[in-house]
Amino acid sequence: MTNTRKNHPLIKIINHSFIDLPAPSNISAWWNFGSLLGVCLALQIITGLFLAMHYTADTTTAFSSVTHICRDVNYGWLIRYAHANGASMFFIFLYFHIGRGIYYGSYTFMETWNIGVILLFMVMATAFMGYVLPWGQMSFWGATVITNLLSAIPYIGPTLVEWIWGGFSVDKATLTRFFAFHFILPFIITAMVMIHLLFLHESGSNNPSGLNSDSDKIPFHPYYTIKDILGLLLMILTLLMLILFSPDLLGDPDNYTPANPLNTPPHIKPEWYFLFAYAILRSIPNKLGGVLALVLSILILMLFPALHTAKQRSMTFRPMSQCLLWILVANLIILTWIGGQPVEYPFITIGQLASISYFCIILILMPMTSLMENHLLKW
């Protein structure tokens, strides 16, 4: 008798990816975030699809259509807040997932890591364009400020900005194209996720020890399916608490005011998950310099494999590197806080110091600490 699960052309792929997949026996809860990100992506696509059924991408009716969704559509408020807060959960898990990769040296899987960084850029672009769609004050001014950064590019900058805007300011053309891109990008992200997994399954998962685990593998199902379900339940619980008790906790009150090109909000700032990068952008007085620092603050992730000087892969047995990584985490929290503060003393200075230390820790201190640990271990 043939086993359909193992022989059917389509089911066989699922079987090799989620059922009979050999997984290390010691991977911790930090390895749960990959599956949670997959669930978040599915949730965002489903809620987004239902929102798109009622939303109109037109400057005169966009804000009203979102209000209509919340007031008149059956459970529209739930769909809208699940989508908005689902994005926040997505980024929390993304940052945990990346942090796990840095801590345990998962970046040595070069292809998987680089595709992951590209995925991060794509998710950030999608989230930014999604924030513009409700056409509130922060949507409009956020779009104006961030797209205007491209004008810092020498020679082609101003033309490029007008090309993206589809006119001489952020208007109907901008909103329509942002909606089109916001709709299509998650599907491209889904395809990229499949490539991300394809490369991961070429090498197999890393594990907390950073050692080769070929001699001690267990099947993914039932061990890690049940573990992922536990993570999923905790995620749903957290998300539901956020949606049902304080749906606007992470949002901006300014976005409940319809977009007005004649009235600038006192503090223009992006969603909380971009604040660290926004703080780095603002900490440099020069426009082009700020834009470069902004891009490099994310692009620097691609340098991690090249900056890995340690003889051990994981930080599990490297306390000095661990300490430095947690300092980096604290630094990012400081940057996130600064990004939400007005541009005045002492926040400017704190932001500049935090930005410098962010790049110094990654580019100088971490590789040097790894070399020192090698020396201390006489490796």
Swiss-Prot record:
- Name the positions where heme b b566 binds: H97, H196
* Cellular compartments annotated: Mitochondrion inner membrane
Cofactor binding note of this UniProt entry: Binds 2 heme b groups non-covalently.
Name the InterPro entries on file: Cyt_b/b6_C (IPR005798), Cyt_b/b6_C_sf (IPR036150), Cyt_b/b6_N (IPR005797), Cytb/b6-like_sf (IPR027387), Cytochrome_b (IPR030689), Cytochrome_b_C_euk/bac (IPR048260), Cytochrome_b_N_euk/bac (IPR048259), Di-haem_cyt_TM (IPR016174)
Cofactor names: heme b
- State the membrane topology: Multi-pass membrane protein
This protein's UniProt keywords: Electron transport, Heme, Iron, Membrane, Metal-binding, Mitochondrion, Mitochondrion inner membrane, Respiratory chain, Transmembrane, Transmembrane helix, Transport, Ubiquinone
Residues bound to a ubiquinone: H201
Please list the GO biological process terms of this entry: mitochondrial electron transport, ubiquinol to cytochrome c
- GO CC, alphabetical: mitochondrial inner membrane; respiratory chain complex III
Say which family it is in.
Belongs to the cytochrome b family.
Output this protein's name: Cytochrome b
Identify the species of origin: Euryzygomatomys spinosus (Guiara)
Task: State the encoding gene.
Answer: MT-CYB
